[in-house]
Amino acid sequence: MVLRSHPFPRQDRPQGSVPRAVPGSPVGPSTSTHSEDRHGPSSSVGTVIGTGTGGLVEAGGQPQPRSSETNGSPSPDPPPGLRGEGTREKSLDPLPQAAMPRGPAQPPAQRPPGPAASSSARRSQPVPQLRKRSRCEIAPSSEQEVRPAASGDPQGEAPGEGGSPAGRSGALTEKQEEARKLMVFLQRPGGWGVVEGPRKPSSRALEPATAAALRRRLDLGSCLDVLAFAQQHGEPGLAQETYALMSDNLLRVLGDPCLYRRLSAADRERILSLRTGRGRAVLGVLVLPSLYQGGRSGLPRGPRGEEPPAAAPVSLPLPAHLHVFNPRENTWRPLTQVPEEAPLRGCGLCTMHNYLFLAGGIRGSGAKAVCSNEVFCYNPLTNIWSQVRPMQQARAQLKLVALDGLLYAIGGECLYSMECYDPRTDAWTPRAPLPAGTFPVAHEAVACRGDIYVTGGHLFYRLLRYSPVKDAWDECPYSASHRRSSDIVALGGFLYRFDLLRGVGAAVMRYNTVTGSWSRAASLPLPAPAPLHCTTLGNTIYCLNPQVTATFTVSGGTAQFQAKELQPFPLGSTGVLSPFILTLPPEDRLQTSL
């Protein structure tokens, strides 16, 4: 498309690039000043306009009349047809400068005769406002060629002026701006690209040093970052150490929502499995003081008329310890000392997530005896005792049961209430109280198939069931044995209740939680009618009292006591034995000897 030659009225000019001069073009007093050349103008389709004191230049090389601002004569308006074409071209988006090449240069228009303006005068002249860019704005690079128009006609040729430093500075500034935008785009999250920077060494020589440094600073505050580094760089050893750290401190991880919520379901399962997967489960026992040890006892008297003998000095009670059993050596050994602050008399005990919890109890003796609401926790993987959130109500002779990651404190002396502890919120919340008419003191409780069962003690042969989903209690069928119950455990969907028979020993009654039926499983003769206290490990039920440590094995449809008797616990003659199961770490002496 060919455009006619016509003058343009003065218009505001936007910021643009400077058209550079073609080597060989004359540079003299008639050329434009640097202050005006710093913003290169744009032209309409087919014509490239150069601005200067010499006027406007057409691409065809014909000089045009100067505008009224230059020579004082008004410029005629362009024909209507050309005005419309200019409007359409202005509405198009401007092309990037890098895409607009240059063609051969045209000689600049001659300046009319007259005195040349001095350099200071030219600097003092106001810089005219730049026009809006057109689509065919000239590219700043003199090595590029003109792109043909859509109609197929060649575009006009652009005149240039001397490549001033100011012009080159403006072009480089725009290039730097484009490069900056590109880098910002590449740095956006999402993996569109990688900004060129310091490259990682191809060898992995630095990674062992980095992993060693991360191991030194590994704690619960940095474990997520270290785990991400280990997974990204293929460091299974470092990842395993991070999992082990979180597993060793599971209660703190559960109580930190910022940490626990950022773990995936697979990570949570792995951390939980490590609590019991890095050692061997062992049988443990804690001797709880008898409820009547703190009561008054009369002094022995001699023959009539004689003064009673002087009372022997009262010795301080020995510190309580947790003990564990070594089945290969058939011996018991102490594991750790129980804190003196923990009131053991009448407390509840259970294990959850390989932690041992002690809750409630009676502190003091006589008229100063008070119930406690404190809860203590022992971590066998770190050998550390700690305290968790106290219960809402002080309790003694309660039962503590773990179910689905929650602790349930059930009943107590003169109490029908129940409350539940969630380690993730570190809070106790009340639950449905036991049915009216029950008196849950010295009772037994166990969890089986998602429900909690309570029997024994002052409940005698009654069996109560609590559903956490419904938060409600109901009563199960009575046991066929109306004898005194000593303990109850769950194994394989069945409840095994150990009743005490005077002059005979212990009788085991089995309850099917699906069919709701009772049956007699086995019996065990005992030298003395001492209650049995039980716990389960695998398919074996360990039954303890001060005289015997027996094993009751359930295999398939048969359940019977084993003939081999284990070493009785030697220190349980003055208290109540409370057995439990814990998994000790491999570094423990008992495990290393095995």
UniProtKB/Swiss-Prot annotation:
Source organism, top-level taxon: Eukaryota
Name of the protein: Kelch domain-containing protein 7B
Polar residues: bias regions: 64-74
Compositional bias (Low complexity): 116-126
Biased composition (Pro residues): 104-115
CDD domains with a match to the protein in the record: BACK_KBTBD11_CMLAP
Keywords of the record: Kelch repeat, Repeat
Statement: the UniProt record of this protein carries the keyword Repeat: yes
